[in-house]
């Protein structure tokens, strides 16, 4: 049975080959159909890829814009944080410096009372009594003057400046007016009398000078 099939196949091969030689168009048509099928599949795949590509690009662009906005917001927060930190550092440094400068303010105010007493004691000594034939009073007076000079040197060393504005223009930040009075030959608004000297500590008024101010006519 198998041998018969083989003989039949061998017998039909020449006829099949002859039909192919006599009909080459069949081969070309089949090949074209095959190629066309492959091309259609490739075109469909490319079209599908082209359709997906714009969507992907759009998504990427949206993500890019979102990330850029987040980055911008983060940088702004970072800059604000840096500015706040710098402001805090400067304020803290200023507070420390002021504490160093003005920490002795209360102590200085107490010393001013001592300086006032020394000044009054010196002024109370009659100048006509300061003579060589009165050595005790002369020595006492000279001792008071030396002490007053020395305490003013200490004040200056620590930034404490004496204010004696006699004849100067009245300054409400440094002077306190006790009264106003017309004074002949004096410019209105100037200090005519200093009742009590004032003091400034590192440029800040520690105690205003108590003064009388010339009043305009």
Curated annotation (Swiss-Prot):
SUPFAM superfamilies: Coiled-coil domain of nucleotide exchange factor GrpE, Head domain of nucleotide exchange factor GrpE. PROSITE patterns: GRPE (PS01071). It is found in: Mitochondrion matrix. The modification N6-acetyllysine is found at residues 94, 100, 215. Pfam families: GrpE. InterPro entries: GrpE, GrpE_coiled_coil, GrpE_head. Probable component of the PAM complex at least composed of a mitochondrial HSP70 protein, GRPEL1 or GRPEL2, TIMM44, TIMM16/PAM16 and TIMM14/DNAJC19. Binds to HSP70, HSC70 and HSJ1B. This is GrpE protein homolog 1, mitochondrial. It comes from Bos taurus (Bovine). The lineage of its organism: Eukaryota, Metazoa, Chordata, Craniata, Vertebrata.
